Curated annotation (Swiss-Prot):
ATP binds at residues 77-84. This is RuvB-like 2. Its EC number is 3.6.4.12. SUPFAM superfamilies: P-loop containing nucleoside triphosphate hydrolases (SSF52540). It comes from Mus musculus.
C-alpha cells in the first residue's frame, strides 16, 4: 500500500524594512567638534562655518556644566547659511537627557492662548527635573507558580509563587490581582522577574541560563540572563526625568495627565506654577530632585513683536530659565508692533543681553560637500559632472533649491532606467522647476497678465 506524504507549505517570511522620513536636517548628528572644541572641516553632517561651530561648541560646553542658564545666544546670517543646522547639531550633541525645545517665532500667535502663555510653556518645556526615589523590589528566578481555583468556579483565586536567587529561596502568597498580572505577562517557571512592592508592577527581565535547554526552538526576542544573586528583596534607586511643563499640566486640572497626550493644555494659572516652583525648590534642598536647564530654540525670532521681546527680557532674569538660542536672517528692519527699526528686528535692550554668533555664505567646496552628504542621506548616486553642475546651480541660486533638485533628478533618472544621476537629468529638472530669481523675471515679463499686480513699472524688492 503506497503512502502519500503530506507536504506543508511554509509561508515566505519577508524582512520588514523600517522607513524613516528624510528631513532637511536629518543628516546632522552633532556639531563635528573634537575634544579641544576645534571644528573639523566636515564631520557629523556639518560642513564649513568653522567660527560659528566653534562658538556653538563653547556654548554647548557651558550648557553641559550648567554654568550658562538664563543666557541668550543669537545666530544671525544670510538665508541658507546653516543657522538652523547649527542649532540642530547642538540638540544632537546634548543628547536625550537635556531638554531641547524648538519653536518658530510665529507659533506663539494663537487665538486659544496669549503670547506670553505660549512663551512661558515653551520655557518650562525646556527645563527638566530629575527626580530620584528609592523603591523596594523583589528580584528572582521563578521556580514554581501554584494557582488554586475554587471548585465551584466562583470566588477569588489564591496561589503561591516560589522565587529563588543563588543564595536563597522563598515562597510568596499571591492575591487575585497578582495572579492576573502573572497570567497577563505569561510568567512561567524559569523566568527572571522583578516585582515593585509599592505598585505591584511585574517586569520580565528574561529567561534563566539554567533553562536554556527547556525548548528546542525559541523566538528571537527571548533573552537569557543570569540568576540573580544575594537577597530577594532589594532597594533600587529609580530616576525619573520630567519637564516643568509636564508637572504644570498634571497639576492644573483633575484629569491633567490626559491633557499631556491630547495637547489641550490651555492657559495654566500662575498660582499653580508658583506652588510647583516652591515644591521643586524644596525637593532640590532635600536632595530628592535636580534641575536640568535645557535649551529653547526660537527660529525666525524677528517674527516676535515688542510685547514678546519685553517678556523675554524679564523671563531671562528668572532663576529657572533655560538657555535661549535664537536665529534670524534679517538685517536692519522694523521691530514688529512698532515703527522703529533695529538690527535683526530685535530691540536694543534685548540685543545687549545676547551673545551673537554670525554665519557666512558657503564656499564652492563646502556647497559641493553638503550636496554629497545630502545625496548619501537620500540614497542617490550622482556622477562627478552632475555634482559640478548642481554645485554651480547652488551658488547661483540657493543651496536649498539645489538640495530640492536632488530627489527630483533621482526620480527622472529612475524613469529612464538609469542608476546614476547625470548632467542631463539635472538640466531637465532645472528647466521644469524655477528658482526664485527666474520666477521673479517671469512675473516681470508677464505682469499685466497676473491678477492684482501691484508692480506698475516699479523695481521689485526681492530681498
Amino acid at each position: 500500500m503506497a503512502t502519500v506524504a503530506a507536504t506543508t507549505k511554509v509561508p515566505e517570511i519577508r524582512d520588514v524594512t523600517r522607513i524613516e522620513r528624510i528631513g532637511a536636517h536629518s543628516h546632522i548628528r552633532g556639531l563635528g567638534l573634537d575634544d579641544a572644541l576645534e571644528p573639523r572641516q566636515a564631520s557629523q553632517g556639518m560642513v564649513g562655518q568653522l567660527a560659528a561651530r566653534r562658538a556653538a561648541g563653547v556654548v554647548l560646553e557651558m550648557i553641559r556644566e550648567g554654568k550658562i542658564a538664563g543666557r541668550a545666544v543669537l545666530i544671525a546670517g544670510q538665508p541658507g547659511t546653516g543657522k538652523t543646522a547649527i542649532a540642530m547639531g547642538m540638540a544632537q550633541a546634548l543628547g536625550p537627557d537635556t531638554p531641547f525645545t524648538a519653536i518658530a517665532g510665529s507659533e506663539i500667535f494663537s487665538l486659544e492662548m496669549s503670547k506670553t502663555e505660549a512663551l512661558t510653556q515653551a520655557f518650562r518645556r525646556s527645563i527638566g527635573v530629575r527626580i530620584k526615589e528609592e523603591t523596594e523590589i523583589i528580584e528572582g528566578e521563578v521556580v514554581e507558580i501554584q494557582i488554586d481555583r475554587p471548585a465551584t468556579g466562583t470566588g477569588s483565586k489564591v496561589g503561591k509563587l516560589t522565587l529563588k536567587t543563588t543564595e536563597m529561596e522563598t515562597i510568596y502568597d499571591l492575591g487575585t490581582k497578582m495572579i492576573e498580572s502573572l497570567t497577563k505577562d505569561k510568567v512561567q517557571a524559569g523566568d527572571v522577574i522583578t516585582i515593585d512592592k509599592a505598585t505591584g508592577k511585574i517586569s520580565k527581565l528574561g529567561r534563566s541560563f539554567t533553562r536554556a535547554r527547556d525548548y528546542d526552538a525559541m523566538g528571537s526576542q527571548t533573552k537569557f540572563v543570569q540568576c540573580p544573586d544575594g537577597e530577594l528583596q532589594k532597594r533600587k534607586e529609580v530616576v525619573h526625568t520630567v519637564s516643568l511643563h509636564e508637572i504644570d499640566v498634571i497639576n492644573s486640572r483633575t484629569q491633567g495627565f490626559l491633557a499631556l497626550f491630547s495637547g489641550d493644555t490651555g492657559e495654566i494659572k500662575s498660582e499653580v506654577r508658583e506652588q510647583i516652583n516652591a515644591k521643586v525648590a524644596e525637593w532640590r534642598e532635600e536632595g530628592k530632585a535636580e534641575i536640568i536647564p535645557g535649551v529653547l530654540f526660537i527660529d525666525e525670532v524677528h517674527m516676535l513683536d515688542i510685547e514678546s521681546f519685553s517678556f523675554l527680557n524679564r523671563a531671562l532674569e528668572s532663576d529657572m530659565a533655560p538657555v535661549l538660542i535664537m536665529a534670524t536672517n534679517r538685517g536692519i528692519t522694523r521691530i514688529r508692533g512698532t515703527s522703529y527699526q533695529s538690527p535683526h528686528g530685535i530691540p536694543i535692550d534685548l540685543l545687549d543681553r545676547l551673545l551673537i554668533v554670525s554665519t557666512s555664505p558657503y564656499s564652492e567646496k563646502d556647497t559641493k560637500q553638503i550636496l554629497r552628504i545630502r545625496c548619501e542621506e537620500e540614497d542617490v548616486e550622482m556622477s562627478e559632472d552632475a555634482y559640478t553642475v548642481l554645485t554651480r546651480i547652488g551658488l547661483e541660486t540657493s543651496l536649498r533649491y539645489a538640495i530640492q533638485l536632488i530627489t527630483a533628478a533621482s526620480l527622472v533618472c529612475r524613469k529612464r532606467k538609469g542608476t546614476e544621476v547625470q548632467v542631463d537629468d539635472i538640466k531637465r529638472v532645472y528647466s521644469l522647476f524655477l528658482d526664485e530669481s527666474r520666477s521673479t523675471q517671469y512675473m516681470k515679463e508677464y505682469q499685466d497678465a497676473f491678477l492684482f499686480n501691484e508692480l506698475k513699472g516699479e523695481t521689485m524688492d526681492t530681498s
